[in-house]
């Protein structure tokens, strides 16, 4: 297809027209004409006409016009996103094939059967998959929950107007509702005035479950069950939940002093309240539906003397759910003991639902059992009483400081000064000791008290409400043992997964030896229940070394971990800390999973889902269903049909690419003394720290570029369209390989090795979104004269990267093989270009005026950030 679907253009045109009506109503025809002039100027500029007219139009805007112009283009981009999302899930003619997301699992199951996999083995493997998607807050998630709900309602009206049998009056009513919703969105502030709290972020995550995933989970499982039955004649077991959810919102305290033990407790209680409330809605619906009299002896024994036994049993469950909800609500305000009626165990939720289900089937009413009751059962298996499992994350340095304070107090010396072997000896001895390490009168510092308070919250919370304890910047076996000891001292007597997160290039290279040392310790092995979980960091390794070297280090670390766990006869669970952007390990999940090393996805897969990508991937039930299908199919395929290990020649060339890539990356980022100052002048990085975008500070406590968090590092370059972290290093690595005459080998790797093909595909995607002209416009407006040559050099490197990828793929244009995607990017550019130029102007004015927070310039700047993030479909 060379042009975007005409119906998508119709929707974009309609939504734009309705937005125009709203803007005209508030600001008049002349202002709307000015917006249209800017839009047409951007379009002409893209077609090669002189861009001076567009720049002049923006330069002439008065201070009062800056904010409404920025808001107009921001809203255009959000409406275009809605139309595009709708296009992805609807409007398929019967003559067209089903979308890939709907076909992927049935086609995979058919292929597996054809290749000799037995029906029993397939059904068993699909039912046993353990996929956990970990929802994380995002310091740059810019869309307010209020607006997201209005955007979802707009998508609903697009679906309503698609019915073919509408009368003209009904069609008119839909357009009126669309007009009203767009007006509501326009007259709602798109940017929050204050930073969200960690609890606000957790509520945002719960809202995604309430409004989308609650519906999507039973829908995708119903279709997976149908696909399995068609391929094997077998059904998914009732207790099967291949995909579950965890969360970092309210548990991730790494670099965020706002996440305290009290916050973690509050979020755990809120999750219990929300879960009980959602089940109560389901039970009310089921009680109205299940009016039947005939029931199995087992159900009748539980229901007592009732003419409507199903309703009687559900009434008992409803009373317990109400008690649970009321207790959780009261416990948010004060410590309240839980009464006997409060539900604490998932079995108590599941058992009455399963009893109803089995009874209906036994009494010949399977068609009723397999309706909303089955949906409720599958939600209960997936979400349980706690909705999501909350992870706790903290930096290893905080644990080292706490241990140092403790050993210092006890007169044992300073833990932080000890060798690794001395630390391990001490920690293993204390872990096996029956006496407490800490005396009751120990008075820790505020930081250590907070670490211990968090561990006590873990001790007091139900095990099923918690996920893993993740240690950021882990680099040694003692990092894991120290957390185990702190948990033990705080009363955590049950096993809890303590997960090292290996982030930098050096730590990734050291991940194998660290885990090998741990797994050789008998005391450690005896405490390990279930799989050994290890987290692979994508963001910091890419910031440290560039994506070329980081991607290869991540791959090799996983290979080594697979080998070590196989040798030690321990099951491995790899946890992937991916971001939304290519520079942070993001990209299409299906391709990414299939590109993992063989053996690394053995029926288990855990990954983070980042703030703004949660909205795009799971914000609407139909979109969520598509993405759940992709995860399910990809993990099943990677488990049963893993890729072959890379050939020695590929490994050798990848070593060369990584070495050349990291050298080229660090020459720019670390060795050029002008680089940090150029970054700060040419991007909105400094301004981002002042904007109320998330609960976590954008920088760690002190330091230069190393202290900058990976997210704003990516965000700054994304806003200016240079996209530097995602490609820098590849241009040198690939060019040198071609110069050595290794082009044929690169082509073979791209053709036959999923890992390399996926890396090149993601590189091509980000290069297609990059724009040297836009990046230059920021330099011209913001950068001091002596730094301009560096900007020109970086844009030259971008051109080299584009040229070498085109040479490798044999195309004349990036994404020529994906015209739909290319057209989506072009459609957005018409609205993005004015926002970029306007943002550069706003940055210049803000820096010159030292604009205070809340000023029109600052507000317009924040809106431009939000609009560009929406237009590019990712932030950091």
UniProtKB/Swiss-Prot annotation:
Gene Ontology biological-process entries: carbon fixation; oxaloacetate metabolic process; tricarboxylic acid cycle
Similarity section: Belongs to the PEPCase type 1 family.
This protein's name: Phosphoenolpyruvate carboxylase
Its EC number(s): 4.1.1.31
Swiss-Prot/TrEMBL catalytic activity: oxaloacetate + phosphate = phosphoenolpyruvate + hydrogencarbonate
Keywords, sorted A to Z: Carbon dioxide fixation, Lyase, Magnesium
PROSITE patterns per UniProt: PEPCASE_1, PEPCASE_2
Pfam families, per the entry: PEPcase
Annotated organism of origin: Pseudomonas fluorescens (strain ATCC BAA-477 / NRRL B-23932 / Pf-5)
Necessary cofactors: Mg(2+)
Gene Ontology CC entries for this record: cytosol
Active site (catalytic residues): 138, 543
InterPro entries: PEP_COase (IPR021135), PEP_COase_bac/pln-type (IPR022805), PEP_COase_Lys_AS (IPR018129), PEPCASE_His_AS (IPR033129), Pyrv/PenolPyrv_kinase-like_dom (IPR015813)
Molecular-function GO terms, alphabetical: magnesium ion binding; phosphoenolpyruvate carboxylase activity
Functional note: Forms oxaloacetate, a four-carbon dicarboxylic acid source for the tricarboxylic acid cycle.
């Amino acid at each position: 297809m060379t042009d975007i679907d005409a119906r998508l253009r119709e929707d974009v045109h309609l939504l734009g027209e309705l937005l125009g009506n709203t803007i005209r109503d508030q600001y008049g025809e002349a202002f709307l004409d000015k917006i249209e002039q800017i839009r047409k100027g951007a379009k002409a500029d893209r077609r090669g006409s002189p861009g001076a007219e567009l720049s002049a139009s923006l330069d002439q805007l008065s201070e009062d016009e800056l904010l409404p112009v920025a808001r107009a283009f921001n809203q255009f981009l959000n409406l275009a996103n809605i139309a595009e999302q709708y296009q992805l899930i609807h409007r398929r003619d019967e003559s067209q094939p089903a979308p890939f997301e709907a076909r992927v699992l049935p086609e995979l199951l058919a292929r597996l059967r054809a290749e000799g996999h037995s029906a029993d083995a397939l059904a068993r493997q699909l039912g046993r998959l353990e996929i956990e998607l970990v929802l994380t807050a995002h310091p740059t998630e810019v869309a307010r929950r209020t607006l997201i709900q209005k955007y979802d309602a707009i998508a609903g009206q697009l679906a309503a107007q698609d019915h073919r049998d509408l009368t003209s009056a009904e069609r008119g009513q839909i357009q009126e509702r669309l007009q009203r919703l767009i007006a509501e969105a326009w007259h709602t502030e798109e940017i929050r005035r204050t930073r969200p709290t960690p609890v606000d972020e957790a509520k945002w995550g719960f809202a995604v479950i309430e409004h989308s995933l609650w519906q999507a989970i039973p829908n995708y499982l119903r279709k997976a069950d149908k696909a399995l039955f068609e391929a094997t004649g077998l059904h998914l077991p009732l207790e099967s939940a291949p995909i579950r959810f965890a969360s970092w919102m309210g548990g991730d305290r790494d670099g965020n002093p706002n996440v305290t033990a009290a916050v973690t407790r509050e979020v755990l209680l809120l999750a219990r309240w929300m879960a009980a409330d959602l089940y109560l809605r389901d039970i009310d619906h089921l009680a109205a539906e299940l009016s039947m009299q005939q029931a199995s002896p087992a159900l009748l024994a539980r229901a007592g003397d009732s003419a409507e036994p199903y309703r009687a049993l559900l009434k008992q469950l409803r009373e317990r759910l109400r008690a649970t909800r009321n207790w959780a609500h009261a416990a948010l305000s004060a410590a309240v003991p839980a009464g006997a009626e409060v539900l604490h165990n998932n079995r108590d939720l599941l058992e009455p639902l399963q009893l109803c289900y089995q009874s209906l089937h036994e009494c010949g009413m399977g068609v009723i059992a397999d309706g909303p009751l089955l949906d409720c059962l599958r939600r209960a298996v997936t979400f349980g009483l706690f909705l999501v499992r909350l992870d706790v994350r903290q930096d290893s340095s905080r644990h080292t400081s706490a241990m140092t304070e403790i050993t210092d107090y006890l007169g044992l010396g300073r833990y932080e000064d000890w060798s690794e072997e001395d630390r391990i000896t001490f920690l293993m001895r204390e872990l096996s000791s029956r006496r407490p390490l800490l005396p009751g009168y120990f008075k820790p510092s505020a930081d250590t008290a907070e670490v211990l308070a968090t561990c006590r919250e873990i001790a007091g919370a139900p095990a099923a409400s918690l996920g893993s304890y993740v240690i950021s910047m882990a680099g040694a076996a003692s990092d894991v043992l120290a957390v185990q000891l702190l948990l033990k001292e705080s009363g955590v007597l049950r096993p809890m997964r303590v997960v090292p997160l290996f982030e930098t290039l050096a730590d990734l290279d050291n991940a194998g030896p660290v885990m090998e040392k741990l797994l050789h310790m008998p005391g450690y092995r005896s405490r390990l229940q279930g799989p050994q979980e290890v987290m692979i960091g994508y963001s910091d390794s890419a910031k440290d070394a560039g994506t070329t070297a980081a991607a290869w280090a991540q791959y090799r670390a996983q290979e080594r971990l697979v080998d070590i766990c196989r040798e030690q006869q321990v099951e491995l669970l790899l946890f992937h800390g991916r971001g939304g952007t290519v520079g942070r390990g993001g990209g299409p999940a299906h391709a990414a999973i299939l590109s993992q090393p063989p053996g690394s996805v053995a029926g288990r897969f855990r990954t983070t889902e980042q703030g703004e990508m949660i909205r795009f991937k799971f914000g609407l039930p139909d979109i969520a269903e598509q993405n759940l299908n992709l995860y399910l199919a990809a993990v099943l395929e990677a488990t049963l049909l893993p890729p072959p290990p890379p050939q020695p020649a590929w490994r050798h060339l990848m070593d060369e690419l990584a070495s050349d890539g990291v050298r080229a990356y660090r020459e720019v980022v670390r060795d050029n003394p002008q680089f940090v100052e150029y970054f700060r002048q040419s991007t909105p990085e400094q301004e981002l720290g002042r904007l109320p975008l998330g609960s976590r500070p954008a920088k760690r406590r002190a330091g230069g570029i190393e202290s900058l968090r990976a997210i704003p590092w990516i965000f700054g370059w994304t806003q200016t369209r240079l996209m530097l972290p995602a490609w820098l290093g590849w241009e040198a690595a690939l060019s040198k390989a071609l110069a050595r005459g290794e082009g044929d080998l690169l082509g073979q790797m791209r053709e036959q090795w999923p890992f390399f093909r996926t890396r090149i595909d993601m590189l091509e995607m980000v290069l297609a979104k990059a724009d040297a002209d836009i990046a230059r416009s920021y330099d011209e407006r913001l950068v001091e004269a002596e730094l301009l040559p560096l900007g020109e050099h970086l844009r030259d490197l971008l051109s080299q990267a584009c040229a070498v990828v085109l040479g490798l793929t044999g195309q004349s244009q990036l994404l020529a093989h994906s015209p739909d995607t290319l057209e989506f990017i072009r459609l957005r550019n018409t609205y993005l270009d004015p926002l970029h130029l306007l943002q550069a102007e706003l940055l210049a004015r803000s820096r010159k005026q030292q604009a205070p927070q809340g000023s029109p310039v600052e507000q317009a700047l924040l809106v431009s950030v939000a609009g560009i993030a929406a237009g590019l479909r990712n932030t950091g």
